[in-house]
Amino acid sequence: MNKVLISVILAGFGAQLAKLIIYWFKHKSLSLHDIFVTGGMPSSHSAFVVSLTTIIYLTEGATALFSLSLVFAMVVVRDAYGVRRTAGNEGKALKKLFKAHHLKSKDHYAMGHTPKQVIIGSIIGFIVAFGVYFLL
């Protein structure tokens, strides 16, 4: 049984499912498009990589693979919060500018995450990894 793969899949899909449920309660509607929208609570990117790093540590210990996954997680989490959030804010500004000048723009722009969304996603990843490790 591949606990690493199970943990990562459960954390990623679990966070994405939580995001859909939160969206549905907030907007009282849901579409297929909403499954693939980036940004929002919680960060599935953070859940995914924190789960990966945690389960590797639990199964392998402090190995080179763990170190690699830790660096990978730091890059992904930083990207989810920093780079993608900045790009999302710029997308918002461009959309307003296009609207003011009656220009066409795409309906969705990729949003990054707030610190709270990243922390909650990370907690989900951590809990899922521990659950998979100790229950399977």
Could you tell me what each predicted segment is?
Residues 1-17, 25-28:
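Helix-loop-helix hairpins and the membrane-proximal interhelical loops
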